[in-house]
């Protein structure tokens, strides 16, 4: 009986210790979650102004910002297009044109754009253009990097200006590339090229003039 009484007397202490451990674990978990939240909040991304092209930093989760040079408003909204669209898009967020989506009669201004559907306009990107469909792009095209996938068949009505290009599909158009242009093995490029550096994989084809510019 004495052993039972001693055991019973220790139970409250054991329970208190257990509760304290649980409380510490909960507080530690909350502190970790708060730390992750603030890390996400403090993460920055580079944004190019739509008005003056000045590049500044803004919170990664922000929906808009103001240019630190000219004070202009810069939208950071992302667009996902699933149907026909002909309204203005001016953002430094990202744009995705889905397979059933189509964009016509406008110049899309954004950061990155992924085209899985139809695009018959122009593109002005501060980031990457990725084309994975059949498109005839009638407007001007400028970007940091252009990626044309092997399933794509693209015709550019005007000269394409980019820093880097990776082509693995069928392309018609003229290119001015200030960096490297890479024709992968499935690539077929019909058009003239002005480029600083060029790589042509075995199997790739190019019809046109090449001008190497330092």
Where are these regions (language model features)?
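A broadly conserved sequence feature marking short terminus-proximal activation segments
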Residues: 1-45
